[in-house]
């Protein structure tokens, strides 16, 4: 009889281990079979539908498509959300109107190529609604969060979720209208937080010129953003020239089209715009830990459309909130007292200029304008062509139907020919509005002004006489000619200033400034500019000032001095330094500015320690702020201003590191549509001057753009432009080499790498190189520059810029260079 071989203990142990391994392999295979349906698919096609419990991920893993149930209800919806972010944020829903109520459902490609959602009984719950004649299609989720249907044969995109929006916009999606084609793409709110079916609020883009964002409740306006002003919506408080706008607006009036798109919030890839079920527009971004609210509207009862009725004014800081515009009274006193302001106000005194007048100019002499500030301008506006501020006033004055006008930076002249609705008074920011009234409405205020002015004048006269007497007594005792107030010399200077149209500039006396600066003590010295030193001072009332001292030996003469006063007195912008006044005593001339605690940009940029206080985000904000200041100078101010000396030391920083362009001694201004001028006296700073200006004296908006490009590259690199000439190459050559090798991403100080986004740095280098192109025509204009910095649109490729190599003993490195062309080189120090 055959006997089985006997296994020893070692064989038994080996056999046991082997069987355990086999068991683990079998278990793993079974487990994979069980959980496989929950893995993300690459795409959806006729043979690979998406079922409940399965998901489709974008290639970068940011977005996910699948089935979800709001608040764990039995209703199933197909949606897109941010992957691995809790709580779940759904950004798009397919079957908003009709949820899946059965336990089984599939999202698949139909026989005609459309994307359809079928329940367990094969009933169609939702579809793209289009037949593409071929089932050789597939659906995939892109990195942008856009679900697309693609033809497998041609590769053509047949359908996009971005063209079928729900309540949310993602970067690169857009709200739009196309009047000829009858298209109007809007955001539509959910009915509630747990019900994605269409709610009562929509966010659309109006076909006005310029357009504005509008939230409707049903068919009625609920909130509006105010007209678009190049980089911002003018009716949103707090969004001024320093605001980094995530929006881009493109409008073609002739074609009847416009789009309102949203770009990424700088470094924050996870961001979105949504319209909530309560009718609020919100912008949110994720910092890796939680969602942060970037913007929200409406936030106040004054934000609600037509809150105070026609010709009413909603005042945010007032209770009750509604008052009538000046010259108007409540239409119904009883309703007004009850807090029902919807009927609004009516004019108290009729205008002399009537709309049915036989002549357009009738009433010009008897109607006046009342000027309001800090307002959200009314709805129902019209763009009055390409008019400057004065022409805007004259156009409205000569048109009997014009009830108000406004000249808005970034827009131009707006006029109102109908009732004024949805006018709001802000605490700060806002625009100016000029309201047409009968002259008698302003006569009372004028009489009050005359009486007040006379009283103030007499008081000042008495004070001056007393002060003059005390000053005379003091000089008699001290035998020192130190008057408290300027007399003959400053009186003469004031007369010289009158024809220069700088009457609004304050005149300081020398004694006051000497006291404020501790007699121009070296300890008060902030820095040295090309035209003289700058001192910190403190007035008697505690106000800190910066004093620019221009002696007879400085390079800035009377013409430049008057030019700086004349220009800055007319310019008002967040990114321009503010002039407080001036002073003259003998050969000395002083300019008094607001004091900016962080001095100039070069103080931080070129200091081995302080440079770490301005990380990449702060540098990017500074770049955009300077660009906005330039946009105001070149396009939005009443006069076109060419700075001609834009450089790092002329960019001052306030306590919030907001940049302000300074030093307008060399600036030139032109009116109307004049874009270019020339001069025989070429002045500026070497390295920053555009070739055509340095060689031929021709300057324009594009020569300032060139200087901005150099400035931008200096901010990125964090090195003085003079350092490169010492090394035998130029800043532009260094930047170009980096662009060719690494697209410029290695230019930023590596110590700041953690705070930067490489793509954003590279984009800024590309913009800088575009700005320093040899031919002015190859450089962007200021509007294009602003768009490049605030959007992620595709940029043109730069050409190799013209640059020269300086030797170490090159005279261009001199701090006091004055050539035969009178080119001046400033000492680069903080001011």
From Swiss-Prot:
Residues 353-439 form the PAN domain. Its EC number is 2.7.11.1. Coiled coil: none annotated. It comes from Arabidopsis thaliana. Its main location: membrane. Residues 43-448 are extracellular. This is G-type lectin S-receptor-like serine/threonine-protein kinase At1g61390. GO terms for molecular function: ATP binding; calmodulin binding; carbohydrate binding; protein serine kinase activity; protein serine/threonine kinase activity; ubiquitin protein ligase binding. It is a single-pass type I membrane protein. Residues 1-42 form the signal peptide. GO terms for biological process: recognition of pollen. Residues 43-162 form the Bulb-type lectin domain. The chain crosses the membrane at residues 449-469. The modification Phosphothreonine is found at residue 679. Residues 520-803 form the Protein kinase domain. The active site is at residue 645.
